[in-house]
Amino acid sequence: MFSRLLNRGNGGVNKNITSGLLLRRTTTTTTRLSYINNSPTLSIRSFCSKSTTITSDEKLDLSGYTTDRIRNFSIIAHIDHGKTTLSTKLLSLTGTLPKSIYGSGEDSLVQKEKSEERREQYLDKLQVEKERGITVKAQTCTMKYRNKEDGKDYLLNLIDTPGHVDFSYEVSRSLMACQGALLVVDAVQGVQAQTMANYYLALDSGLEVIPVINKIDLPTADVERVKQELKDAFGFHPDDAVLVSAKTGVGITDILPAVIDRIPPPQEPTKSPKVPFKALLFDSWFDRFRGVICLIKVVDGKVKKGDSIVSAGNKQTYEVFDVGIMHPEQRPAPSLFTGQVGYITPGMKTSKEARVGDTFYMKDFPVEPLPGFQPAKQMVFAGIYPVDSLDYTQLRESFEKLMLTDSSISMTNETSVALGMGFRCGFLGLLHMDVVLQRLEQEYGQVVIATPPTVPYRCLLTDGKEILISNPAGYPSAEHLSKTFEPMVTGHVTLPTEYFGAVVKLCMDSRGILTNQETLEGNRTRITFNFPLGEIVTDFYDNLKRISSGYASLDYEDNGYQESDVAKVRVLLNGEEVDSLSAIVHKSNAQRYSRSLVKRLRKVIDRQMFQVNIQAMVGSDVQARETISAMRKDVTAKCYGGDITRRRKLLDKQKEGKKRMKQMGCVELSQEGFLKLMKSTNDDD
């Protein structure tokens, strides 16, 4: 049948059928009667299978958008201030969202609510983002917009960024592709810690910042107070703020005209008849069919399919297989021009080749590389092990696939006596670690055991050599150690004044040193502490939210290393060290930590036929000890009287047997026991 269709002349119908077959698209057409303005209309809807093949007629021509009609901007804010909802509203305003997520006028109320929810979370692609209601990965989208003031069409490139401090690296690299930013502030909560951190990131990048006060529809919104906070904190004039409600759509139409009017266009191209191509790589992800897809900002020249480009970082040459923009999904275009943001498919096989901050240029026209980014710096390390040791290979493959979309993770092989083979992984923060573990389970079906998070310590040895320790098991012994330096951070806590005493006590208990205190508008205070990173990567943030009823916010940045009096706490079971339970703690906290640990261990270790001694030691000093008594068999049960020496003989024989068993026996902490220990640690927190 298929061959007959191909051999039937060039009639219109047969030609169309042949084209459809060559495109490998399965299309079903249905006819339905719908009502528009209370009048029946006949609509034809086509449902296509998931094929990414797009004909050349569907490609966008971007050559008409000169740099003066292009605006590149990000949306930055503190977590949960409404960035993604606002971004999706702008996509809806410009007609960029696909119609399939809108629903029809005949949909039920439940269907409409689901449609509304899909629209609000459209830019949150990952399942973990939708479940937690947070943005983890920055998302890019290009919008076409006709400005009513001058009647011109503009190309607006929007980047929705994360708000949590763990993902500030995503924000910083996104800002490098922009000339401006919308600083979104909650009309109820006002300026928070991450609001200030993101503002200064934008300021350091030389961006024009437009303040946007969101959620003005809430009954508790205080717009005038937030305007004053923006003025005091950043120097904005009260009239500079755009007032909106991303939920209801109030004021949304004022944002894009402000973007066009106040954010400068990309720089003019070099005045030359042949401008050499130069582009900045600011993001990438992996597609198993097409390889690495790179998001770029074209600084000069243009790039099209078939061009040969060179990476300034690794000096390798790549052929461009595809070019396009995110509108909102991948949409092919003949070329990308100066000032435009889009994607290219250069045929890279691994994401390691796509180094964020790299410069691309044409093969025969080398250029000066652009200023790049600082690589992501891992702040928290943990051991990750499969629940079943047979799943080690699958876990490694799953991690490698995940790292293709998140290059900020580091991974090295590690072996534990208790848990077997696994990995020592580095993360940007505790939330980042939690998100990665959740993605491993949801996207790859890998349930893992994670050891307590640690931070990297610098150790100066007696021979003058300096080493970096991220695994407590590798901490050097006292006779080989000269000094230890622990990582420090500068933490900024913004809180209502009524919680000041409790928050300061929490910071002091976490070995924080107060360096600054500032009174803000609206009965709020901002305090600055120098913290050891190891004190705040576990339960500090949760405790801060608990004692402040959720109103306090935290932001922190790296502050180098500082000499510290820390020690390694070793755990011994009948004299045998369990490496996976080792920890590095400050000596002032060593005894309290040790007592808590051995008590929890006593609950999860099964009783043996011999006595089990649990010890927590620092050097040769025992900090805490617990004993699990042996199970005892009543060997005298068969004695019904008679000489007492018979009973003593049986008891002495049992005692001698237990002594030999203790010498030869081995106490093992099972994976189930280790998992219970980790859960009890979280419960205690």
UniProtKB/Swiss-Prot annotation:
<feature type="binding site">
    <location>
        <begin position="160"/>
        <end position="164"/>
    </location>
    <ligand>
        <name>GTP</name>
    </ligand>
</feature>
<keyword id="KW-0547">Nucleotide-binding</keyword>
<dbReference type="Pfam" id="PF03144">
    <property type="entry name" value="GTP_EFTU_D2"/>
</dbReference>
<keyword id="KW-0472">Membrane</keyword>
<dbReference type="Pfam" id="PF00679">
    <property type="entry name" value="EFG_C"/>
</dbReference>
<dbReference type="InterPro" id="IPR038363">
    <property type="entry name" value="LepA_C_sf"/>
</dbReference>
<feature type="binding site">
    <location>
        <begin position="77"/>
        <end position="84"/>
    </location>
    <ligand>
        <name>GTP</name>
    </ligand>
</feature>
<dbReference type="GO" id="GO:0005739">
    <property type="term" value="C:mitochondrion"/>
</dbReference>
<dbReference type="InterPro" id="IPR000640">
    <property type="entry name" value="EFG_V-like"/>
</dbReference>
<keyword id="KW-0496">Mitochondrion</keyword>
<dbReference type="GO" id="GO:0097177">
    <property type="term" value="F:mitochondrial ribosome binding"/>
</dbReference>
<dbReference type="InterPro" id="IPR009000">
    <property type="entry name" value="Transl_B-barrel_sf"/>
</dbReference>
<dbReference type="InterPro" id="IPR000795">
    <property type="entry name" value="T_Tr_GTP-bd_dom"/>
</dbReference>
<comment type="function">
    <text>Promotes mitochondrial protein synthesis. May act as a fidelity factor of the translation reaction, by catalyzing a one-codon backward translocation of tRNAs on improperly translocated ribosomes. Binds to mitochondrial ribosomes in a GTP-dependent manner.</text>
</comment>
<keyword id="KW-0378">Hydrolase</keyword>
<dbReference type="GO" id="GO:0005759">
    <property type="term" value="C:mitochondrial matrix"/>
</dbReference>
<comment type="similarity">
    <text>Belongs to the TRAFAC class translation factor GTPase superfamily. Classic translation factor GTPase family. LepA subfamily.</text>
</comment>
<dbReference type="Pfam" id="PF00009">
    <property type="entry name" value="GTP_EFTU"/>
</dbReference>
<dbReference type="GO" id="GO:0003924">
    <property type="term" value="F:GTPase activity"/>
</dbReference>
<dbReference type="GO" id="GO:0005525">
    <property type="term" value="F:GTP binding"/>
</dbReference>
<keyword id="KW-0648">Protein biosynthesis</keyword>
<dbReference type="GO" id="GO:0005743">
    <property type="term" value="C:mitochondrial inner membrane"/>
</dbReference>
<dbReference type="InterPro" id="IPR027417">
    <property type="entry name" value="P-loop_NTPase"/>
</dbReference>
<dbReference type="InterPro" id="IPR013842">
    <property type="entry name" value="LepA_CTD"/>
</dbReference>
<feature type="binding site">
    <location>
        <begin position="214"/>
        <end position="217"/>
    </location>
    <ligand>
        <name>GTP</name>
    </ligand>
</feature>
<dbReference type="Pfam" id="PF06421">
    <property type="entry name" value="LepA_C"/>
</dbReference>
<keyword id="KW-0342">GTP-binding</keyword>
<dbReference type="GO" id="GO:0045727">
    <property type="term" value="P:positive regulation of translation"/>
</dbReference>
<dbReference type="InterPro" id="IPR035647">
    <property type="entry name" value="EFG_III/V"/>
</dbReference>
<dbReference type="InterPro" id="IPR004161">
    <property type="entry name" value="EFTu-like_2"/>
</dbReference>
<dbReference type="InterPro" id="IPR035654">
    <property type="entry name" value="LepA_IV"/>
</dbReference>
<dbReference type="InterPro" id="IPR006297">
    <property type="entry name" value="EF-4"/>
</dbReference>
<protein>
    <recommendedName>
        <fullName>Translation factor GUF1 homolog, mitochondrial</fullName>
        <ecNumber>3.6.5.-</ecNumber>
    </recommendedName>
</protein>
<feature type="domain" description="tr-type G">
    <location>
        <begin position="68"/>
        <end position="267"/>
    </location>
</feature>
<dbReference type="InterPro" id="IPR005225">
    <property type="entry name" value="Small_GTP-bd"/>
</dbReference>
<feature type="transit peptide" description="Mitochondrion">
    <location>
        <begin position="1"/>
        <end position="54"/>
    </location>
</feature>
<keyword id="KW-0809">Transit peptide</keyword>
<keyword id="KW-0999">Mitochondrion inner membrane</keyword>
<dbReference type="InterPro" id="IPR031157">
    <property type="entry name" value="G_TR_CS"/>
</dbReference>
<dbReference type="GO" id="GO:0006412">
    <property type="term" value="P:translation"/>
</dbReference>
